[in-house]
A protein has these predicted regions:
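Terminal helix/beta-alpha structural elements that buttress the NAD(P)+-binding lobe
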Residues: 1-182
Length: 182
């Protein structure tokens, strides 16, 4: 939902997918079109809404299958898919650029990531410092809002929350644990 808001504020027409129970919620965050990700016509639905002008996709589900679907949705000229996990790029259309934005990169230091060693990136550190100021302002001004939350209780409820999440029961919300009650 954060990405939907940033894209909308940046002037993009946001087309997204979700389960039908979250259509209205995602529209309230700025999505112009929302389609059922389980629909057998989801690729055609998104393509039709984009009117052949789809260039950028953010895949927050981040599985090989979801990234493949994203790539198939892009028109023949290609485009850019940002995904949260590495995928086997050898199976993807060469006209598509795949980006994996890693939060760790904002430290500006090298770090191991699975079998890869990610290089230091002073540029990412400088970018993140600039954007932290901008994002803070957007939040304070009410232009960015957080996801709906589900309060699970105290730290004793963490195991329950992890099970809840592993069973696929977390949809369009963040699980929150009360560490200190005032």
């Amino acid at each position: 939902m954060f990405v939907i808001q940033l894209a909308t504020l940046s002037g993009f027409k946001v087309i997204t997918t979700s389960s039908p129970s979250n259509f209205d919620l995602l529209k309230s965050y700025g999505a112009k079109y929302v389609f059922d990700y389980k629909s057998p016509t989801v690729i055609e639905d998104v393509s039709r809404a984009a009117n052949g002008r789809l260039k950028y996709i953010f895949d927050c589900h981040a599985t090989d299958n979801s990234t493949q679907t994203a790539v198939k949705t892009l028109p023949g000229a290609g485009g850019v898919v940002a995904t949260l996990l590495y995928v086997d790029e050898s199976t993807l259309d060469r006209k598509v650029e795949v980006h994996v934005p890693l939060l760790y990169k904002i430290s500006g230091k090298a770090f191991p990531f699975g079998p890869r060693q990610m290089p230091a990136s002073p540029e990412d550190k400088a970018w993140s410092e600039e954007w932290c100021v901008k994002l803070s302002k957007l939040v304070v001004e009410g232009n960015i809002r957080g996801n709906p939350i589900k309060v699970m209780g105290g730290l004793e409820a963490v195991a329950e929350g992890l099970k809840f999440m592993q069973e696929g029961n977390v949809h369009a919300q963040k699980l929150v644990y009360e560490v200190l009650k005032e």
